[in-house]
Structure formats: structure tokens, C-alpha cells
Amino acid sequence: MAAAEMERTMSFDAAEKLKAADGGGGEVDDELEEGEIVEESNDTASYLGKEITVKHPLEHSWTFWFDNSTTKSRQTAWGSSLRNLYTFSTVEDFWGAYNNIHHPSKLIMGADFHCFKHKIEPQWEDPVCANGGTWKMSFSKGKSDTSWLYTLLAMIGHQFDHGDEICGAVVSVRAKGEKIALWTKNAANETAQVSIGKQWKQFLDYSDSVGFIFHDDAKRLDRSAKNRYTV
């Protein structure tokens, strides 16, 4: 599914739902007498009332986190600067949060903004993440906003064939540009990881090569860690 299509998928086709609520019709068999008023059916009126209050649940609950790497040297332990911001579990709550937070181009230098499945912390030490790894994409400064949104939509909309492998994503703002990383939980599962990498590129219409680094390699070798998979 193309990136723009995913955004449309997260909206609601009210016309189709109204048609279903009205019994699938749409045509009036009998002509109206002059001055006659068509009364709204009880089914349609009931549907319209529900549409205002009913929320559309996601496959998983997700949590937004914020971190500022420039403060880490002053912390007693790595990760203590992480802040849990907001947890959402419906389409409506996602948009409510997304529309009221800074997008990557507006974040301060050194900021890391995360969106992870609920109860998974964006740290290597988290039990779900411990044996995983990351796919990474690079962007020029101020150019990652749309790709970040489409990454979020692909994750929370369960667009990946191996969506259960995904832990979350993070956008990092640095002096040289911005990076988006997609975290997965089982780095050794090459078939799943390669599938995720290929689909991610497709969703974002991203043409450059992207690489996958194991968390174990990153912990041991830091910036010297090499890509295990490339797509």
C-alpha cells in the first residue's frame, strides 16, 4: 500500500457506513407529494449518534516517549532521561495526540521521539527488544516529518506482514540531519527482518538503501557496528 493510501486508510468512509446503516439503499422508490418531507429513519439517526462517540480500536496500544541525548552525560544511568508522554489505543486518540505534539522538524537538537507498543520501553535492555535490532533511514535536516507520520501509520495500522516483530520506532534529530529507526524484536529472523525493511521502504517511497544492525553489535561495537541485512 502506498504512503498516501495509508493515510486515507486511517480516515473513515462515512458515506459507505451510512449506506450500510440505511439497509444498503440510496434510492427512493415512491415519488414525494409536493410539500412532503422525508423523515430520517430511526436506524440512520441511531447510527449518526453513535458515530460521534464510537472510537475505532487499534490492534495494539502504543506509547509516545521523549528523550534528549544531550542530557545523558548528566544522568546517573542511560535511559533515565526517557519520559513517558501518552498512551493511545484508538485511531481517534492517535490523531488527537499527533496533532498536538511537535513534529521532527520542530524538535530541539539532540531530541529522540519514540512510539513503541505499550509496555515496551525504547531501550536495548527491555526484554522484548534485547535480541532485536533496527532498520535506519537518514534524512536532510527538517525533511523527515512526512516519513515519520507514514512510519507511524504503517506501524499502528498493522500494515507490515510481520507486524508482530515490530517493537516501535524513533526519530532522532541531530546537527547533520534526522534519522528514523524501526526497532524489531528478533534480529536473527532474517526472513521477517528483510520483509519489514522492504515494506518500510515501499510505504515511504524511500529509494536509498537501508541497513539493519543487531542491538548486540551496537552495544559491543558502537558506531563500528556493521549492517547484517541491507535492502
From Swiss-Prot:
Entry GO terms, CC: cytoplasm; eukaryotic translation initiation factor 4F complex; nucleus
Listed result of changing residue 77 to D: In strain: PI 247087, allele pot-1
Post-translational modification summary for this protein: According to the redox status, the Cys-129-Cys-167 disulfide bridge may have a role in regulating protein function by affecting its ability to bind capped mRNA.
S-S bridge residues: 129-167
Effect of residue 48 to F: In strain: PI 247087, allele pot-1
GO molecular function, one term: RNA binding
Record localization: Nucleus; Cytoplasm
Residues the entry annotates as binding mRNA: 74-79, 106, 124-125, 174-179, 219-223
Effect after changing residue 109 to I: In strain: PI 247087, allele pot-1
Region ranges (EIF4G-binding): 56-59, 66-102, 150-159
Pfam families in the cross-refs: IF4E (PF01652)
Keyword Cytoplasm: yes
GO BP annotations listed: defense response to virus; regulation of translation; translational initiation
Note: Displayed sequence is cv. PI 134417 and confers susceptibility to potyviruses (e.g. potato virus Y (PVY) and tobacco etch virus (TEV)).
Assembly and binders: EIF4F is a multi-subunit complex, the composition of which varies with external and internal environmental conditions. It is composed of at least EIF4A, EIF4E and EIF4G. EIF4E is also known to interact with other partners. In higher plants two isoforms of EIF4F have been identified, named isoform EIF4F and isoform EIF(iso)4F. Isoform EIF4F has subunits p220 and p26, whereas isoform EIF(iso)4F has subunits p82 and p28. (Microbial infection) Interacts with potyvirus viral genome-linked protein (VPg); this interaction is possible in susceptible hosts but impaired in resistant plants.
Membership in a protein family: Belongs to the eukaryotic initiation factor 4E family.
Function: Component of the protein complex eIF4F, which is involved in the recognition of the mRNA cap, ATP-dependent unwinding of 5'-terminal secondary structure and recruitment of mRNA to the ribosome. Recognizes and binds the 7-methylguanosine-containing mRNA cap during an early step in the initiation of protein synthesis and facilitates ribosome binding by inducing the unwinding of the mRNAs secondary structures. Key component of recessive resistance to potyviruses.
The protein's name: Eukaryotic translation initiation factor 4E-1
